[in-house]
Amino acid sequence: YAIFALLFGFSFFIQDDNQRLRGNDFRLRFCWRLILLFLIGNINASFFTAEVLVLYSLVGFILPLTCRLKDKWIFALACLLLIQPLPLYYVIRACLDPEFVTPAIPTRSFWNATFAVQSNGNFLETIRVNLWEGQLASLAWAWDHGRVFQTAALFLLGMLIGRKGLFLKEHLKVWNKVLAGSLVAFFPLYGLGNMLPDFITNKSILTPLSLCLLYTSDAADE
């Protein structure tokens, strides 16, 4: 998933850069391609509920909107998105106000409605529910589990990787450092995330904080 999202942003850079060198502006054409991707994603969703193309087509508009920014601003925006700003706000709000309740999306009801028709409905009924309740369930799950912010961040990082030429052989050492740093960061974060329920009982703090640390959430069970 992460590799696919990075490559989505990277491929945008390649196309945009090639067109820019020819004196063309690729942004409007890419927006049109996102619309086509949205349509293709819905065709796919007619038969497979958990597809990601619709999410990519919606989040993908961040690329033409930011591609003319300087590298430092793109990197800063990507980092902001990676820390899950909305769940982080919920954590701070819940810490300051014990009565605050994290807003919830009825994800479970969307899935239940979808599975009920998939189990007992005919072909046309299944297509209909997949395109409505099924898509709402899929997008709600992505929202509950931080995938919207994360996907946008990975798109931006993929574009930035293209700008910096980090996929070239001479930058192999950079990826070795990234791997080492990721391994070092993973274990304490994973351990901290697993210990949180033992110390935090307020779900309005626990759920978004777990999302910020590990991109895991039990919100879909609500």
Give the positions of each predicted feature.
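Aromatic-anchored segments of alpha-helical transmembrane domains
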Residues: 38-45, 82-90, 184-193
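Long hydrophobic alpha-helical segments that form multi-pass transmembrane helix bundles
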Residues: 80-157
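Hydrophobic alpha-helical membrane segments of integral membrane proteins
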Residues: 46-62, 73-78
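Conserved small/polar residues in nucleotide/adenosyl-binding loops
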Residues: 215-222
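Solvent-exposed interhelical
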Residues: 62-77, 160-181
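Membrane-interface interhelical connector segments
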Residues: 197-209
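Membrane helical hairpin/interfacial module
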Residues: 1-47, 53
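Hydrophobic cores of alpha-helical transmembrane segments in multi-pass inner/ER membrane proteins
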Residues: 5-10, 151-159
